[in-house]
Amino acid sequence: MRQGLAAYQATGSERHWPYYLALLADAYGSRGQTAEGLSLLAEALAPMGRPGERGWVAELHRLQGELLLAQAGDRHRVPEVETCLHQALDVARHQQATSWELRAAMSLARLWQRQGKRQEAYDLLTPVYCWFTEGFDTADLQEAKALLEGLA
């Protein structure tokens, strides 16, 4: 994947570059290489002033929070994780990006569930999930439903 991104970058195109970096960061995170993933997310968030690239900001912040949580392994970075996830929620809401909002809400709800804040997690996720009227066979909505059932 890294080679493919290098080849793409060599073309001089920067279109969707933050998104591609986010995909690679997520892959690194899945392999436990959180430092590499966080470095890529920092790079992805840097050019967010460019027109057309702001659509990924919510997901970038969510992934940053997820990787920070995976890296921390303890409670010392939880405030930083929560800040990232709240930023993801705020950006998604401002952009009216319901799919990104659902993902951010699920991430924050899972964190709160681990902290014993089950009711807060349920109250956060329920209205976001209820906005959807279709697509209930998608992975995100199935995951949200399962999370809500576990919180109820």
Language model regions located:
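Helix-coil-helix junctions within alpha-helical repeat/solenoid scaffolds
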Residues: 1-152
